[in-house]
Amino acid sequence: MTLNLRVLSPNRVIWDSEVQEIIISTNSGQMGVLPNHVSLVTAVDIGVMKIRLNGKWSTMALMGGFAKIDKDRITILVNNAERDVDIDLQKAQETFRRAKACLVQAEGKRQVIEADVALKRARTLLEAINASPSDSN
């Protein structure tokens, strides 16, 4: 049995095909979805989504949004997302370094929050391609 997974951003369709299983980051933790899952709507946190297709796992960096699950259909609406195969390691590492520097230099609550979110997004890109953020010092 399979699931129909669609991942949509405001600009494009990022994924639209059958999968065997997914694991997504929600605001309350990781959630696995298999065929015949109970119907629900949930917020999707910034994090890595794992996708099992033909017995192999791939990943996608999700930048927050919402997921609607209805038995064998999953629609995920995201602010942005990148498939692991589309992420440039050097660009992701540079983004991570810049985000860390911005967090260190942030002044005031708003700047700290914005810098922290930027760092979380940058870390998610690296995690999606299995690169350790600590390798990006």
Curated annotation (Swiss-Prot):
Q: Which InterPro entries does the record associate with it?
A: ATP_synth_F1_dsu/esu, ATP_synth_F1_dsu/esu_N, ATP_synth_F1_esu_C, ATPsynth_dsu/esu_N
Report the GO terms under cellular component. Answer: chloroplast thylakoid membrane; proton-transporting ATP synthase complex
Q: Tell me the subunit arrangement.
A: F-type ATPases have 2 components, CF(1) - the catalytic core - and CF(0) - the membrane proton channel. CF(1) has five subunits: alpha(3), beta(3), gamma(1), delta(1), epsilon(1). CF(0) has three main subunits: a, b and c.
User: Which protein family is named in the record?
Assistant: Belongs to the ATPase epsilon chain family.
Topology versus the membrane, per the UniProt entry? Peripheral membrane protein
Q: Which residues form a coiled coil?
A: none
Q: Name one GO molecular function term.
A: ATP binding
Record key words, sorted = ATP synthesis, CF(1), Chloroplast, Hydrogen ion transport, Ion transport, Membrane, Plastid, Thylakoid, Transport
| Species of provenance | Pinus koraiensis (Korean pine)
Q: Which gene encodes it?
A: atpE
- The name this protein goes by in its record: ATP synthase epsilon chain, chloroplastic
Q: Point out the signal peptide segment.
A: none
The superkingdom listed in its UniProt entry is Eukaryota
Q: What does this protein do?
A: Produces ATP from ADP in the presence of a proton gradient across the membrane.
Q: Where in the cell is it found?
A: Plastid, Chloroplast thylakoid membrane
